[in-house]
Amino acid sequence: MESLSRAGQEMSLAALKQHDPYITSIADLTGQVALYTFCPKANQWEKTDIEGTLFVYRRSASPYHGFTIVNRLNMHNLVEPVNKDLEFQLHEPFLLYRNASLSIYSIWFYDKNDCHRIAKLMADVLEEETRRSQQAARDKQSPNQANGCSDHRPIDILEMLSRAKDEYERNQMGDSNISSPGLQPSTQISNLGSTETLEETPSGLQDKSALSGHKHLTVEELFGTSLPKEQPTVVGLESEEVEKLPGDASQKEPSSFLPFSFEPSGGGPQSENMGIRPAAHHSVQPEVTTPVLITPASITQSSEKQAPSYAIPLHPVLSPTLPAEASTAQAPPSLPRSTTMMQAVKTTPRQRSPLSSQPVPELSQASLAASQSPFRAPLNVTNTASTSLPSVDLLQKLRLTQQHDQIQTQSLGKGAVAPSFSPAAGQLATPESFIEPPPKTAAARASASLSNMVLAPLQSMQQNQDPEVFAQPKVLSSAIPVAGPALVTATTSAVSSVLLSPSVFQQTVTRSSDLERKASSPSPLTVGTSENQRKPSIILSKSQLQDTLIHLIKNDSSFLSTLHEVYLQVLTKNKDNHNL
């Protein structure tokens, strides 16, 4: 029987530990009890739905005793800790008690012997808890004890912290004396500060610490004495970090993300005025060109149109200018139009990839200038004709850098280099210099008319659409013999410092209006022919195409919208063809 009861107690103890892991043993138990509660409003007892076995147990943490009723009816059990606030009263077969929340309960026992035994055990436990609480109160009020910690307690957290602090200070002082003897005055000063704080503590504590070898410090004393020692070192480290910050920031400043690798160069300082970057910053030559002067006629005409007069900014990181490009930096005003345009193509500096060198807001400003100003419209059309339409092939939009390099090498190898002379930069251009030369052959006239018919509708469609991809910083070879005098004036003013007369701008206005009038009704045949002429000959590799597409899709929302528009157009065309 004893073995069976012991096995049952072990099983019951394991079940109780699942609810409270601090339970160590079972002090007593009884078989059948029921719980009643007293209702003060009705002044009567009410039976609860708790009925089962009563266990009195011991715990390893405060409160050190408690009792519970394991309910047989449902999952709601009674758990009551035993402390000094409990009050018990015996009325056979009931054991009444009141807890700390002033709730009155009554435990009904099936066996009266169990009721007496449990009542006696509860009285002993309550007396022990009362004695323990009184001892704890006396320990807090005792002047010989610091922070209410008694000697017989097994764990003292403040004592452990103070001991660790002393060991750390001794190790730090030994390391500083061995490694750097020059720091001894500072350690002596810190030692003086620590002794001063120790002198402020009561003499009784110092005598006790000298005898026992342990110091009892408060939290303020423990963490207050270490602050003056750590503060100078922290300040010194912060000052060193501040001194190193400017150099590190200048050295580790990340450059803009590029899909391709380019050669870096120390470009000149960028202008901060409306994103304008002078042309002298894109070359390696030390000389600086003089600013372009605009005549009053051009100022009045541009103010009426309210068009911005700044050009599309270029990125300052560029490859060095070739000697042939430097020799053609300034074009004479008396040269024919075709020669001047070839010089403009040659003098255009080599640029980084336009996919990352030009932000989207600047493109929107450039497209606004192209749609409002009649002087800049032909130049913008020739620069961005292949990138403004959604129907243009996407590969043609992505082959920007290779096509630009190929055009530059072809123009430098085949075209005649114009003689460079500096005195002509300050001369005034005459109206005769802008007169078109007579056409040589009928084929040239036909190509000029076809290209004019293509470029004008491209310009009108570009004005109605937002910029979808970054503009190409080049002049297409197919559009070189086609553009009118407006292209000549804009290019020569951007490259050299030629002073222009008012009659030139009047002539460009009339010619641009004539071009727009002629190109009002383009044919599909001419559009297809021009697209075939503008098709690049260099094909990107798979890796370059992948990097470029990933970069544009992640960083350019307009490019993604362009892809979606092209996809919708192709889808609608396929549906229409299927319906037909």
UniProtKB/Swiss-Prot annotation:
InterPro entries, from UniProt? Answer: Dcp1, mRNA_decap_C, PH-like_dom_sf
Which domain of life, per UniProt?
A: Eukaryota
| Record bears the keyword Hydrolase | yes
Indicate the enzyme's highest-level EC class. hydrolase
Cite the EC number: 3.6.1.62
Could you tell me which residues belong to the region Disordered? Answer: 132-154, 172-209, 245-276, 343-371, 510-533
Site feature: (Microbial infection) Cleavage: E238, S239
UniProt catalytic activity = a 5'-end (N(7)-methyl 5'-triphosphoguanosine)-ribonucleoside in mRNA + H2O = N(7)-methyl-GDP + a 5'-end phospho-ribonucleoside in mRNA + 2 H(+)
Show the SUPFAM superfamilies listed in the entry. PH domain-like (SSF50729)
What would you give as a GO molecular function for this chain, any one?
A: enzyme activator activity
Modified residues annotated as Phosphoserine in this record: S62, S142, S179, S180, S319, S334, S353, S422, S520, S521, S523
Q: Which BP terms from GO are recorded? A: deadenylation-dependent decapping of nuclear-transcribed mRNA; deadenylation-independent decapping of nuclear-transcribed mRNA; nuclear-transcribed mRNA catabolic process, nonsense-mediated decay
Residues annotated as carrying Phosphothreonine in the record are T348, T401, T526, T529
Bias-annotated ranges (Basic and acidic residues)? 132-141
In UniProt terms, what function does this protein have? Necessary for the degradation of mRNAs, both in normal mRNA turnover and in nonsense-mediated mRNA decay. Removes the 7-methyl guanine cap structure from mRNA molecules, yielding a 5'-phosphorylated mRNA fragment and 7m-GDP. Contributes to the transactivation of target genes after stimulation by TGFB1. Essential for embryonic development.
Q: Can you tell me which family this protein belongs to?
A: Belongs to the DCP1 family.
Q: Give the record's subunit note.
A: Forms a complex with EDC3, DCP2, DDX6 and EDC4/HEDLS, within this complex directly interacts with EDC3. Part of a cytoplasmic complex containing proteins involved in mRNA decay, including XRN1 and LSM1. Interacts with DCP1B. Interacts with DCP2. Interacts with DDX17 in an RNA-independent manner. Interacts with PNRC2. Interacts with SMAD4. Interacts with UPF1. Interacts with ZC3HAV1. Interacts with ZFP36L1. Interacts with NBDY. Interacts with DHX34; the interaction is RNA-independent.
Record protein name field? mRNA-decapping enzyme 1A
The organism is Sus scrofa
Q: Which gene encodes it?
A: DCP1A
